[in-house]
C-alpha cells in the first residue's frame, strides 16, 4: 500500500473568508483531503501580528472560521483541523528555526515590505512571521503545501531553512514541495481587478464575503469594473481586460466551464448579461454554503470538540518532530 503524503495549510481568523478564498483555497482543500493526509490549522498566532483585539473577538472569529471550513466540506474525519495556539510546539520550533534564519532573508520578504509601508512601530512578530510559517509546515513533516503566488517566497524560505538545518544535523525535516492552483488561485478585486480580492480592503465593494446577503452580492457584481469597449468584447485577457477576465474566472471556477467555452457562449453578449450570469453562479453556491454555515455555527460545543480532537491528532505528530529536532541539536528530552 502506498503511503499518503502529508499536506499542510491554514488560514488566519481575521474575518469571514472571501469568494476568492473559497475558490482559490477552501474548495481545493476539499479535493486535496481525499488524496493526502490533510492538516489544516486556524492560524490564530499569525493573526496576532496585525491584530491586538480582545480575547472574545479572537475566540469568536476562530469558531466562525472553523464553521466555514466545515460548511466548505472540510471533513474532520478525513482532515486534522486544529487551532495553532493549542500546539505549543509551533512556537518552540519557531524559536529554534529563528536561530537558523538570517535577518536579511526576512527583511527581503515582499509581504513584509508591503506591510511596513507607512507604519512607525513594526512588531517583531511581523518580521519573523515567515519563520513561524516555516515551523507550521516543517513540524508536520509536510510533503506538499498548496500556495497562492503571493506565498511562494515564504515557502521557498521554509525550504531554505529546512535544508540549512538538515545540512548541519541530518535529515530531520522533509523538504516541502508546492502546488499552485490554476486560475482560481487569484480571484481579483471587483472594483480594482489589478489587485487581489482581499477582506483587509476597507472598501467592501472590492470583495464578496462568503456570508454576504444576496442583495449585497447583486449590487457588488453589478458595480464590478469592466471596460469601455463598444461593442462589448467578452474575452479573457488579464493585461488588456482585467475586469472581464476576473468575472470569467469566477464563473469558470464556480460552474466548471472552460474559459474558451465561456468566450464562445458570451460572444455578442452585453457586460450586463455577463454580470447577471456571474451573479447567478455566486448566489447558487453561497446559498448552499450559508445554510450549512449557520446550522453548524449554532452548535458551539460541537465546534470546540472538533478542535479538541484535532489538537490531539496534531500534537502527536508535532511532539514526534520536536523530539527529533531537540535530539539533533543537543536539547535534552526527558
UniProtKB/Swiss-Prot annotation:
Q: Where is this motif: 'HIGH' region?
A: 13-21
Against Pfam families, the record matches this protein to:
tRNA-synt_1b (PF00579)
Provide the protein's localization.
Answer: Cytoplasm
Q: From what superkingdom does this record's organism come?
A: Bacteria
Residue numbers covered by motif 'KMSKS' region: 196-200
* Binding locations of L-tryptophan: 136
Swiss-Prot/TrEMBL GO biological process terms: tryptophanyl-tRNA aminoacylation
Q: Which UniProt keywords apply?
A: Aminoacyl-tRNA synthetase, ATP-binding, Cytoplasm, Ligase, Nucleotide-binding, Protein biosynthesis
| Entry GO MF terms | ATP binding; tryptophan-tRNA ligase activity
Q: Which GO terms describe its cellular component?
A: cytosol
The kind of enzyme this is, by top-level EC class, is ligase
Q: Which residues bind ATP?
A: 12-14, 20-21, 148-150, 187, 196-200
Its catalytic activity?
tRNA(Trp) + L-tryptophan + ATP = L-tryptophyl-tRNA(Trp) + AMP + diphosphate + H(+)
Q: What is its EC number?
A: 6.1.1.2
PROSITE patterns named in the record = AA_TRNA_LIGASE_I (PS00178)
Self-association state and partner proteins as the record states: Homodimer.
* Family per record: Belongs to the class-I aminoacyl-tRNA synthetase family.
Its function? Catalyzes the attachment of tryptophan to tRNA(Trp).
- HAMAP family named in the record: Trp_tRNA_synth_B (MF_00140_B)
**What is the protein name for this chain?**
Tryptophan--tRNA ligase
Gene for this chain: trpS
Amino acid at each position: 500500500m502506498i503511503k499518503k503524503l502529508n499536506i499542510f495549510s491554514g488560514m488566519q481568523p481575521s474575518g469571514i473568508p472571501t469568494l476568492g478564498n473559497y475558490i482559490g483555497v477552501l474548495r481545493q482543500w476539499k479535493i486535496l483531503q481525499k488524496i493526502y493526509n490533510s492538516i489544516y490549522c486556524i492560524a490564530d498566532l499569525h493573526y496576532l501580528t496585525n491584530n491586538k483585539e480582545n480575547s472574545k473577538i479572537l475566540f469568536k472569529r476562530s469558531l466562525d472560521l472553523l464553521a466555514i471550513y466545515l460548511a466548505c466540506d472540510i471533513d474532520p474525519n478525513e482532515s486534522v483541523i486544529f487551532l495553532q495556539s493549542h500546539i505549543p510546539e509551533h512556537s518552540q520550533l519557531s524559536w529554534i528555526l529563528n536561530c537558523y534564519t538570517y535577518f536579511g532573508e526576512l527583511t527581503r520578504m515582499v509581504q513584509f515590505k508591503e506591510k511596513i509601508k507607512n507604519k512607525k512601530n513594526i512588531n517583531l512578530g511581523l518580521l519573523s512571521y515567515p519563520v513561524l510559517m516555516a515551523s507550521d509546515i516543517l513540524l508536520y513533516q509536510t510533503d506538499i503545501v498548496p500556495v497562492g503566488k503571493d506565498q511562494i517566497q515564504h515557502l521557498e524560505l521554509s525550504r531554505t531553512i529546512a535544508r540549512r538545518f538538515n545540512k548541519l544535523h541530518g535529515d530531520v525535516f522533509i523538504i516541502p514541495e508546492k502546488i499552485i492552483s490554476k486560475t482560481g488561485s487569484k480571484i481579483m478585486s471587483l472594483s480594482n481587478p489589478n489587485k487581489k480580492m482581499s477582506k483587509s480592503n476597507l472598501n467592501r465593494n472590492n470583495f464578496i464575503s462568503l456570508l454576504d446577503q444576496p442583495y449585497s452580492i447583486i449590487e457588488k457584481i453589478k458595480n464590478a469594473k469592466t471596460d469601455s469597449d463598444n461593442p462589448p468584447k467578452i474575452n479573457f485577457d488579464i493585461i488588456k481586460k482585467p475586469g472581464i477576465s476576473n468575472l470569467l474566472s469566477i464563473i469558470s471556477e464556480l460552474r466548471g466551464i472552460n474559459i474558451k467555452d465561456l468566450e464562445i457562449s458570451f460572444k455578442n453578449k452585453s457586460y450586463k448579461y455577463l454580470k447577471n450570469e456571474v451573479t447567478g453562479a455566486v448566489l447558487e453556491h453561497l446559498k448552499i454554503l450559508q445554510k450549512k454555515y449557520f446550522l453548524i455555527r449554532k452548535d458551539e460545543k460541537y465546534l470546540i470538540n472538533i478542535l479538541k480532537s484535532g489538537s490531539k491528532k496534531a500534537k502527536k505528530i508535532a511532539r514526534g518532530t520536536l523530539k527529533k529536532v531537540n535530539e539533533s541539536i543537543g536539547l535534552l528530552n526527558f
